[in-house]
């Protein structure tokens, strides 16, 4: 018997990431090749943005995707989020010239407070929310705090791009395929302070740390390369990473919904105090997923070097959280 369609909301739907994302969702890459979807697409109520969204929708129609059971354009989150099962919050206020980080936090706090309230009011009670728009962890925290009637664990932030970037760097360093790398994960904020950790990682059962055995490379090449990759792409392409961000969003939601079969991945999720991270901080953790639920991998030893790295990214997140507290 055919499955009932799942409703998927995407914000910033006419943007670069939206354009790289929507066709893949409609093709079944995110929720499964047997799962029909209805796309509920949100853009700002600006004539140009709405017109661009219509153009993207025309292209999606022209793909004649068998799994696409419906599609609507919206300018109001209260209608866009109605009964949605998955919400991808991609649209965010980018940092403009001369804008301080505090200005950026407050501009985004307004957007994500409104979207959190709308999800709280009209989304499915089991909605799975992924925040992609930066600063992703803090935006996810704001949305979660603005939706008190939804389970807090339904709100997540995207650390999967950092995770995938780390995988590709390890693959390049070892000369092994990405698919052979297991147990690599990322702690903390989706920012240059994130801590990609391969101390437990293996390739074909062998320790990656022993294979590479180069703490200087780890500290001076690997971590800065992964942490500053977004800036390097802007420098090279003149635009921020869109296709790789869309790909990471698909990976994140697919694994959350369909399960990882015991494989460890990275998700930004609200802490319950694990590994000494204060409750409610939206933090990148190693997780496994099963039956639509994620579970933090517990019992990992955190050495002194790692403790220092985790503290740096936690301090940054605590600073961001303090910077928006008065807006909530």
Curated annotation (Swiss-Prot):
Keywords attached to this Swiss-Prot or TrEMBL record, sorted alphabetically, are: NAD, Oxidoreductase, Tricarboxylic acid cycle
**Record EC number:** 1.1.1.37
Quick one: which residues bind NAD(+)? 12-18, 108, 115, 132-134
Q: Which residues bind substrate?
A: 95, 101, 134, 165
Extract one GO BP annotation from the record: malate metabolic process
Note the InterPro entries from the entry.
L-lactate/malate_DH, Lactate/malate_DH_C, Lactate/malate_DH_N, Lactate_DH/Glyco_Ohase_4_C, Malate_DH_type2, NAD(P)-bd_dom_sf
CDD domains reported for this sequence: MDH_chloroplast-like
* Name of the protein in its database record: Malate dehydrogenase
Tell me what organism the protein belongs to: Ralstonia pickettii (strain 12J)
